[in-house]
Structure formats: C-alpha cells, structure tokens
C-alpha cells in the first residue's frame, strides 16, 4: 500500500519524473498452453457461434467474407434453413470483454479458449485487446478464421491463434474440469475453488450459445455445477466465476 501511494503521488499533477524501477507496476508472465504447472483458472467458451460466409467473389480485394450474425443476416440464415439462434457471435464478444477486463486476467491467473460450434479451437492471449464494438470484433474474427492467427502490431507475438484439438492437450496436468448446468447443484464459487488442492487448476466450460443442451463438454468434464437459482447469461456466468476465483485467491 505504501508503494501504491508513492506511485500515485509521483503521478499526481503530471509529474514527469521517472519512477524508481521498484515502483513501476510489473506485468505478470503471460500464461500459455505450454505451462502445465502454474495454478490458474481456464475458461473455455464452448459452442461459440463464429462462422464466416462469402458474400462476394472476384472483387478488387479478392473474396469478401462476413461473420454470420442474427441481426444482419436473417434473410441469409432463412435461405440456409438455419435458426437465428445459431448465429450469435455477440455472446462470445460479451464474454471475452468480461473475462479479459477482469482483475484475475490482469493478475496473470486466467486463460481463455474458444471452441466454435464447427469444432475450431482458438487460444486467446491474455494481453489481447478485444475491440469494444461488435462491428470491429466481427472483422477481427473473420481475419482470424481465415488467416488462423492474429499477430501483435509491435512484435511477432500471436494474440489469437487456431490450435489443434482436443482442448485437454492444452490444460495443466492437474486440473479440475467443470461445466455449468441449470439442473446441477448450486455452488458458491469462492468456496468451491478454495477446496481445490494447492497445485490444482480449474477449467470451466461455458456455453457461448443462445440456447441448447448442456452436454457440449460431457466428454471432458469431471463435474457439472450450477451458479444460481436463476438463469444466467454466459457473460454473467463468466463474471461470477472470475469474482469467485478472485476472492478465493485474494486478487483485488
């Protein structure tokens, strides 16, 4: 707390003096799937509606694709015989903003993956800045799905990348895997996480779809849990798990 107050005092009033190295906030190491030991929380956004569709060919810039969504492509979805609930990439967008903005992510204790409804697995770098507007997010996802990775402008670091299935190959060696179900016993997240072993991580599969069965992760999970006596959106479910882990691990 003393160091925090000295940092604030140094910055107050536009002080341009360089801070001592010991006072400069240090970014935590970036977690990757290669790290099989560090205790953390992993969130897998399962059944995510991220699907592109070609809308023009042989244009000046080549073929043009869009990210299917229920607001802009109702007519197209109808022609394809698809329900509009199958085109909800906005759910994934909301979840990513919630997760990546969280203190647990800034503390370096969160990893995020996306499993699309088409079986594509995506690793999300904790430092990536997801666009706030859905239009820009859509453009980014189209680029990712066709180029298979998005690199940082300032380095060769990959911020988003398509990786090989199955998801279990990328999880820590000791990891409790759970998924959310409205029919499962309701838990208090903080209490649940505090009961994990000292070296045990937790992986939560969250359904990033408008509706559907909760069997999307049955082949992976150890247990199904409930978070509330009321139906929750995917974004709120992500938020509750983040807050619970932050409280359990004393992340402020």
UniProtKB/Swiss-Prot annotation:
Q: GO cellular component terms?
A: 90S preribosome; cytoplasm; nuclear microtubule; nuclear periphery; nucleolus; nucleoplasm; nucleus; small-subunit processome
Q: Which domain of life is it from?
A: Eukaryota
The site feature described as Stabilizes Arg-88 is recorded at 90
Q: Name which cysteines form disulfide bonds.
A: none
Task: Give the disruption phenotype, in one or two sentences.
Answer: Depletion of EMG1 affects growth and leads to strong ribosome biogenesis defects, with defects in 20S pre-rRNA and mature 18S rRNA species.
Q: Where does S-adenosyl-L-methionine bind?
A: 180, 207, 212-214, 227-232
Q: Where is this site: Interaction with substrate rRNA?
A: 88, 129, 132, 136
Outcome when changing residue 132 to A: Loss of substrate rRNA binding
Q: What is its main location?
A: nucleus
Query: Which Pfam family is an annotated match for this chain, by its short name?
Result: EMG1
* Variant or mutagenesis effect after changing residue 237 to D: Almost complete loss of SAM binding. No effect on growth and ribosome biogenesis
Q: Which GO terms describe its biological process?
A: endonucleolytic cleavage in 5'-ETS of tricistronic rRNA transcript (SSU-rRNA, 5.8S rRNA, LSU-rRNA); endonucleolytic cleavage in ITS1 to separate SSU-rRNA from 5.8S rRNA and LSU-rRNA from tricistronic rRNA transcript (SSU-rRNA, 5.8S rRNA, LSU-rRNA); endonucleolytic cleavage to generate mature 5'-end of SSU-rRNA from (SSU-rRNA, 5.8S rRNA, LSU-rRNA); maturation of SSU-rRNA; ribosomal small subunit biogenesis; rRNA base methylation; rRNA methylation; rRNA processing
Question: What is the role of the protein in this entry?
Answer: S-adenosyl-L-methionine-dependent pseudouridine N(1)-methyltransferase that methylates pseudouridine at position 1189 (Psi1189) in 18S rRNA. Involved the biosynthesis of the hypermodified N1-methyl-N3-(3-amino-3-carboxypropyl) pseudouridine (m1acp3-Psi) conserved in eukaryotic 18S rRNA. N1-methylation is independent on acp-modification at the N3-position of U1191. Also has an essential role in 40S ribosomal subunit biogenesis independent on its methyltransferase activity, facilitating the incorporation of ribosomal protein S19 (RPS19A/RPS19B) during the formation of pre-ribosomes.
Which proteins does it associate with, and in what oligomeric form?
A: Homodimer. Interacts with snoRNA U3. Interacts with NOP14 and MPP10. Component of the ribosomal small subunit (SSU) processome composed of at least 40 protein subunits and snoRNA U3.
Q: So what family is this one in?
A: Belongs to the class IV-like SAM-binding methyltransferase superfamily. RNA methyltransferase NEP1 family.
**What name appears for this protein in its UniProt entry?**
Ribosomal RNA small subunit methyltransferase NEP1
Organism field: Saccharomyces cerevisiae (strain ATCC 204508 / S288c)
Lineage, top ranks: Eukaryota, Fungi, Dikarya, Ascomycota, Saccharomycotina
């Amino acid at each position: 707390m003393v160091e925090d107050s000295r940092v604030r005092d140094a910055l107050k009033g536009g002080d341009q003096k360089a801070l001592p190295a010991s006072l400069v906030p240090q970014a935590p190491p970036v977690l990757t799937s290669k790290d099989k030991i560090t205790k953390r929380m992993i969130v897998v956004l399962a059944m995510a509606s991220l699907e592109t569709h070609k809308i023009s060919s042989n244009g000046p810039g080549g073929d043009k694709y869009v990210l299917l969504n229920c607001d802009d492509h109702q007519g197209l979805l109808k022609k394809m015989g698809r329900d509009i609930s199958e085109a909800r990439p906005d759910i994934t967008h909301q979840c990513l903003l919630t997760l990546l903005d969280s203190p647990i992510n800034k503390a370096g204790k969160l990893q995020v993956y996306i499993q699309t409804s088409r079986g594509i697995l995506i690793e999300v770098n904790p430092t990536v800045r997801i666009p706030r507007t859905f239009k820009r997010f859509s453009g980014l996802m189209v680029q990712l799905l066709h180029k298979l990775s998005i690199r940082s402008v300032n380095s060769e670091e990959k911020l988003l990348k398509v990786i090989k299935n199955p998801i279990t190959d990328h999880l820590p060696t000791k990891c409790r895997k759970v998924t959310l179900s409205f029919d499962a016993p309701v838990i208090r997240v903080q209490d649940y996480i505090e009961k994990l072993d000292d070296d045990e991580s937790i992986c939560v599969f969250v359904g990033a779809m408008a509706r559907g069965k909760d069997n999307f992760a049955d082949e992976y999970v150890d247990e199904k849990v409930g978070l509330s006596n009321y139906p929750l959106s995917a974004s709120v479910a992500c938020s509750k798990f983040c807050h619970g882990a932050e409280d359990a691990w004393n992340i402020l």
